[in-house]
């Protein structure tokens, strides 16, 4: 019986694909070597310890229907679209070795006619007249008895959108998390016009089989039927939840300020695990009572636009004469924290 396993996802849902990856990783026998090939529609994928409000333009993501997905490995934020091919190599220890999986990807690229090399921060680069250009980035995760290496290859990604979503608004964030290093990148289509996701997957698969001297039939993973993976439903629910994707952010502080016709407002938030641990309001409004009440209501609540808006509007009952001010405040806060 082969020790290899090859899985190919036909889903573009990042939460589905990351849930599949997590389930396979947790449940695979320690003797198995796994290759999982997949890709995501418009998504910003952040590292396990990153702060989405720091890393991403979350407001523009919401406007453009771009998803946020937190992965279980470390590293920085990346934008995925269908111009990316994603790969995951898994193996038990002591056989797990990220240099092996890196070599397999380099061999696949070489077979396609691209000479690339490993570089620095877990990247694969190609030499161009303008200097080294990144075509692949990776991240890793290890437990006591197993490990995985996953990454992306840029085939025909929309690089302008990458800059849109990974450049955050100039907000006054004092984050305790990590801001990603931005890298100079290029698409493989610049080197191999017409290259497709299917061709890249085939090349990686062949290099995987060649390295281990075995072949195995591919398993197609699809959301049309629930994958036969123990605890998949629970894993998918967690992977797609606000609590995981946003709530796992490191502690940070956020200062919002705005001037309205009725006065200036400053809101200071301390946020931990997606919850507001402290809310302070400063204003030169002639009637500060609604804002003072708002600070008390926000304490302990979720740092989510809809929840903040809900708390603002709840004050209309106690302060009906300030309806105009509270509605303006509600709209501003909801937009500012997205």
Swiss-Prot record:
Keywords: ATP-binding, Cytoplasm, Ligase, Nucleotide-binding. One of its GO terms (biological process) is protein modification process. Pathway: Protein modification; protein lipoylation via exogenous pathway; protein N(6)-(lipoyl)lysine from lipoate: step 1/2; Protein modification; protein lipoylation via exogenous pathway; protein N(6)-(lipoyl)lysine from lipoate: step 2/2. (R)-lipoate binds at residue 134. Residues 29-216 form the BPL/LPL catalytic domain. GO terms for cellular component: cytosol. Its main location: cytoplasm. ATP binds at residues 71, 76-79, 134. Gene3D superfamilies: Bira Bifunctional Protein, Domain 2, CO dehydrogenase flavoprotein, C-terminal domain. Its EC number is 6.3.1.20. The keyword Nucleotide-binding applies. GO terms for molecular function: ATP binding; lipoate-protein ligase activity; lipoyltransferase activity. InterPro entries: aa-tRNA-synth_II/BPL/LPL (IPR045864), BPL_LPL_catalytic (IPR004143), Lipoate_ligase_A (IPR023741), Lipoate_protein_ligase_C (IPR019491), LipoylTrfase_LipoateP_Ligase (IPR004562). The keyword Nucleotide-binding applies. It is an enzyme of class 6 (ligase). It is found in: Cytoplasm. It catalyses: L-lysyl-[lipoyl-carrier protein] + (R)-lipoate + ATP = N(6)-[(R)-lipoyl]-L-lysyl-[lipoyl-carrier protein] + AMP + diphosphate + H(+). Monomer. Belongs to the LplA family. Catalyzes both the ATP-dependent activation of exogenously supplied lipoate to lipoyl-AMP and the transfer of the activated lipoyl onto the lipoyl domains of lipoate-dependent enzymes. In the transfer reaction, the free carboxyl group of lipoic acid is attached via an amide linkage to the epsilon-amino group of a specific lysine residue of lipoyl domains of lipoate-dependent enzymes. This is Lipoate-protein ligase A. It comes from Escherichia coli O139:H28 (strain E24377A / ETEC).
């Amino acid at each position: 019986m082969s020790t290899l396993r090859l899985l190919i996802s036909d889903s573009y849902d990042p939460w589905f694909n990351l849930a599949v990856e997590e389930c396979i990783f947790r449940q695979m026998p320690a003797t198995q070597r796994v290759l999982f090939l997949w890709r995501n529609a418009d998504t910003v994928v952040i590292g396990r310890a990153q702060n989405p409000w720091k890393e991403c333009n979350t407001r523009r993501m919401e406007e453009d229907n771009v998803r946020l997905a937190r992965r279980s490995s470390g590293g920085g934020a990346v934008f995925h679209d269908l111009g990316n091919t994603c790969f995951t190599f898994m193996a038990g220890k002591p056989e797990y070795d990220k240099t092996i999986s890196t070599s397999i990807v380099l061999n696949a690229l070489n077979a396609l006619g691209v000479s690339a090399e490993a570089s620095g921060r877990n990247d694969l680069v190609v030499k161009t007249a303008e200097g080294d250009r990144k075509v692949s980035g990776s991240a890793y995760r290890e437990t006591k008895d197993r490990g995985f290496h996953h990454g992306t290859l840029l085939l025909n990604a929309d690089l302008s959108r990458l800059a849109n979503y990974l450049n955050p608004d100039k907000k006054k964030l004092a984050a305790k998390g990590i801001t990603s290093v931005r890298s100079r990148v290029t698409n493989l289509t610049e080197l191999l016009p017409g290259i497709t996701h299917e061709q890249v997957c085939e090349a990686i698969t062949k290099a995987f089989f060649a390295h281990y001297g075995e072949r195995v039939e591919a398993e197609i993973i699809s959301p049309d039927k629930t994958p036969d993976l123990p605890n998949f439903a629970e894993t998918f629910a967690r992977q797609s939840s606000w609590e995981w994707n946003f709530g796992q952010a490191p502690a940070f502080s956020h200062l919002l300020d705005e001037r309205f016709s009725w006065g200036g407002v400053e809101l200071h938030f301390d946020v931990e695990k997606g919850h507001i641990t402290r809310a302070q309001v400063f204003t030169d409004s002639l009637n500060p009572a609604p804002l003072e009440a708002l600070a008390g209501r926000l304490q302990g609540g979720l740092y989510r636009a809809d929840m903040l808006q809900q708390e603002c509007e709840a004050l209309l009952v106690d302060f009906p004469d300030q309806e105009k001010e509270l509605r303006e405040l509600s709209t501003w806060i909801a937009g500012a924290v997205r």
